[in-house]
From Swiss-Prot:
UDP-N-acetyl-alpha-D-glucosamine binds at residues 10-12, 124, 195, 250, 295. It is a peripheral membrane protein. Cell wall formation. Catalyzes the transfer of a GlcNAc subunit on undecaprenyl-pyrophosphoryl-MurNAc-pentapeptide (lipid intermediate I) to form undecaprenyl-pyrophosphoryl-MurNAc-(pentapeptide)GlcNAc (lipid intermediate II). This is UDP-N-acetylglucosamine--N-acetylmuramyl-(pentapeptide) pyrophosphoryl-undecaprenol N-acetylglucosamine transferase. Keywords: Cell cycle, Cell division, Cell membrane, Cell shape, Cell wall biogenesis/degradation, Glycosyltransferase, Membrane, Peptidoglycan synthesis, Transferase.
Amino acid sequence: MKVAISGGGTGGHVYPALALIRELKKVHPEAEFLYIGTEKGLEAGIVKREGIPFEAIEITGFKRSLSLENIKTVMRFLSGAKKSKQILRDFKPDVVIGTGGYVCGPVVYAAAKLKIPTLIHEQNSVAGLTNKFLSRYTDKVAICFEEVSDSFASEKIVFTGNPRASEVVGVDSEGALEAYGLVSGKPTVLVFGGSRGARGVNEAVEAILPEWNNRDFQLLYVTGDVHYEKIKDSLAELNLGYHISVQPFIYDMPKILNAVTLVVSRAGATTLAELTALGVPSILIPSPYVTANHQENNARALEKNNAAIVITEAELKNTNLMATVDSILNDETKLNGMKLSAKQMGRPDAAAKLVEAVLSIMK
């Protein structure tokens, strides 16, 4: 069995692809994989580190507004599709899977033209431009949010969830909090703004740290590498208690997510898949800097189901974040209700469901 996968640009497209590869290997240990991405995307480094064969094509994304740059993008798309056809002819995959990001456009399109079975995976509640385009040519469209189903032909849709969800369930959290100077078994809030951190989130947290010093519950505050030194210097005079741990980055996030009580974070699709799979309540601060405001749409889906509270970045200045945290952690009924709601939205079997969808289209 040979599988070609393409997706990239951000971790939200790459990590689901890797989760799918790992799940496919469980079912078909003999399977061969080829990842097609760009050298400039996040995928180049991550995929190569995983030891998965990698081929690169050159492609850029379309602008949503009228732009001369889009003419160049069309030319790159056609060139990328031509190169993708050659790569696919050489590899001879049984199936080709796209997990989003503009790089998978020419790859999945080329596969469809070569009559190779194809599937695309849409992680967000708002369909990406590439997946909208590809859905006309693919055999199946796997989705994670019911809200996005109107963007695709109903006969092609299969609801699988995000395969990253399966990778956090059942992870041993022993010693996870202690590794960051905190105590196991105590109510703990994790705050993070994505892999690089988020200035808006950081500013809101810094503003309430003096108040947090007087709380019993713990805080694991992840600033992001690029913000860490500046924030550490600004906090030096606060004499923060031992129940507050400030870190630049968390490398063992699945372990930490299994150990915390509440999460304050952005609303990327992968993060939400992990939180709901584990039943972790959240305060979501969607990034306003993403395509079609998809993070807010993702977050509202959780809020609608009582699994999260949403605060937009514009609202942060006039919102007491500490009071919002208090309102959840000091109300056991509310906390448990949010846990249950998050769990009910979760798809811990998402990886297996996606594998099932992939196998169903193979000739």
